[in-house]
Amino acid sequence: DRRLTILTATFIPCGAKLPVIAMMGGVMTSYATGSYEAGGLMAPCMYFIGIVAVLVAAIILKKTKPFSGKPAPFVMELPQYHIPSAKTVLLHVWERLKGFIIKAGTILFLACVVMWFLSGYGFVNGSFGAVEDPGNSLLAVIGGAIAPIFAPLGFGNWKAVAASLSGFSAKESIVSTMGVLANITGDASEDAVTVAEAVRTWFPSAVAAFSFLLFNLLDSPCLAAISTMAKE
């Protein structure tokens, strides 16, 4: 039961997937309303889909040999509840903040640098160097080679595929990769809409955008989650 829970719990959207849900939700609603500001309404829907995916996956896995058998009894002894001290609260806050800073300063930063390099350099006329057209970049070559695999899902665009691939290292890097590929500069509040407008051109319809969102919701978790699952 513990292994089953570990494997299926990843279908529930984590905090790292919320920016992707907000971005793609805005893209999807723009097809119907013309506005990119209603994307937050997709979050409850994605959580509901995640819960359904957990139930379906658990039922299917329970019928397989590695997870079959009688459920093990679960006993948890809870200590008495106490009001936490300020020191304890601050220590827990610092641990979470430190973990995020380390993740943002290592995995996310390196992922953005790698995506920037791959999208800014490539081979033109037989020589390697900086490219003005992202379509001639190394990332376009890699994404274009893999894109046909994702074409049946509705997003055979190399930029969408590249953004999805970056999510395997950290889900937070999906939106940042979209920003890099969209060549966004300027005010951040305006950039959010500009990125969404650029991303919309990657998908032929709202269904394709939903397919992209659903794929990144239910695909393999990030490296940090996989390493934690292995330890458990």
PLM region spans:
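Transmembrane helix-loop junctions at the membrane interface of multipass transporters and ion channels
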Residues: F11, G15-A43, S227-E232
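Long hydrophobic segments that form regular secondary structure
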Residues: S35, K62-P71, Y81-G129, A147
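Hydrophobic alpha-helical transmembrane segments in multi-pass membrane proteins
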Residues: P13, K17-L18, A22, K103-W116, ...
